[in-house]
Amino acid sequence: MQPTNTQDPQYYHRVVDCQWACPAHTNVPEYIRLIADGKYTESYMLNRESNVFPGILGRTCDRPCEPACRRTRVEDEPVAICRLKRVAADLRGDVDHLLPKAPESKNGKRIALIGSGPASLTVANDLVPLGYECVIFEALPKAGGLMRSNIPSFRLPVRVLEEEIDMILDMGVEIRYDHRIESLKEMLGSGEFDSIFIGTGAPKGKELDIEGRQEADANVHIGIDWLESIHFGHIDSVGERVLVIGVGNTAMDCCRSSLRLGGNDIKVMARKSRQYFKASPWELEDAEDEQIEILVNHSPQKFVMENGRLTGMIFDLVEWDEDENGRLVSKKLGEKFIEADDVILAIGQDNAFPWIERDIGIEFGDWDMPVVDRATFMTTREGVFVGGDAAWGPENIIWAVEHGHQAAISIHQYCQDESVTDRLPYGMNLVSTKMGLHEWRYSNDYDPNLRTEMRYEDLEARLADIFVEAELGFDLKESVREVERCLNCDIQTDFTTNLCIECDACIDVCPTHCLTMTHNGEEEEVRQRLTAVAENTEQALFASEALPQTARIMFKDEDLCVHCGLCAERCPTAAWDMMQFDLLIPYAGQEPWPTTAPTASTTSA
């Protein structure tokens, strides 16, 4: 194996599993340490730099960071990263003086943002401080896109939503409400804008084209449209017996909303078994805690009407197996009629671009979607960019935020006549955490410590009012207990080869057997003869230069390390140190890092 290039920021970044998994690369360990220090405002602002909406995401994020959390190396449950984000948002002080501001003089460039969801708002957040005039076109009477229209208030209070949206709009963003764009060609032809960003989401709910659908139309609702109608006050009740078709997160929002609008017999109907559900595990748990019944292996076949009124649906009872090609095939076992007063369809979302003409230089590809470059977010027409769900279909808010950041970089470079593909690389700062010979300015308790359970509003109280937030959030005591579970994965081992005397002390003290000194070889073979076989090939092996006495190599399995620092504490020659890694993330208008190399390294005793 070749020695590991520790000058590459991606080496350290990959080891901070939570930050690596986050689409926006939020510095999770640092914001958790700030919470531990009671610095809630600083934690909030660190969050906001990358994910823009800490209060919103602290309640609604799909949490890609948590399955990656290194805490699961020592026990079953990850750190409650998402809920700690909410702690920072709930307990922060005033941040108005800390928010980015628009300069007094503009740069003369005008940007159109179609849609006011998280992607468009992020673009505005990044470009307005650079002097751009951003104009948002929103078809609805309020901003937020699907964050507003599709996430119920019992999960995301309107107060939290509007507070964080207003932080961006109050920079001086112009927004034109109730303004649906009917023709992109017309907008392009007006010459009013130097660049256009399309962030219209995936606004079209999928239909269920089966027998009786048209006849039952009055009592069959498209999930995302139904949730929007609830938010804007057009729907305030539902029938007692409700069937929700689908098992994604929208389906969970629909069934829980039905309970709060008068339904008392709510069933979620799934075509397949639980292992194929698309809903997040915690969304399923919340629904089932509210006594929602989920029926599996029920395939909808027919809406049943009597005397012009919907009475229920007929389902095929099925079982699933794989064919010779490994594809799932169903076998019908029978039929079942289930009563219903209302049916809500939550089986997916589609994009809709009837307003983008096909003769303006924008190519369309699979699923009638615009062809969008995955690095620059530009379409095949220069100056027109797409992000969020509008780019490649439905994803979570955090993905839309990252799309917005990347699109803002491209828009800025396009408007400054720079190449949109010439992007600043990530950088890093490395700072030693050493305070004394064997002391470090962080603590790391890798002993088992169970995840803190979320407290909920009383069931009767929350079901009585759709505006009552279900989750109460962590109190101070719970927050303290949960932050202690973080393993500080951004504080990483740093090895100096020429200081090593090959005494094996670090290997002896390592609690996870992640260190081995042995002769070199091909990686696949080396992985098999380490102290603990390194089976997870998605995590790198650290390989040192040849050691001075025996020419052996110090190997470290990054998958097993819990960042405890015992190797550095035990080492008699300081060959091991613990360095805090800070990923430098380029945003729109970012000046080059203060070094010609891709890293900026700082060491502090």
Region locations from a protein language model:
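Feature captures the FAD/FMN-dependent oxidoreductase FAD-binding
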Residues: S105, R110-I114, E162-I210, K302-I314, ...
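FAD-site-proximal beta/loop scaffold in flavoenzymes
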Residues: A216-E240, D323-P394
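Iron-sulfur cluster-binding cysteine motifs and their immediate structural context
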Residues: Y12-D37, G58-R86, V135, V173, ...
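N-terminal Rossmann-like FAD-binding beta1-loop-alpha1 element of flavoenzymes
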Residues: R110-V135, T250-L259
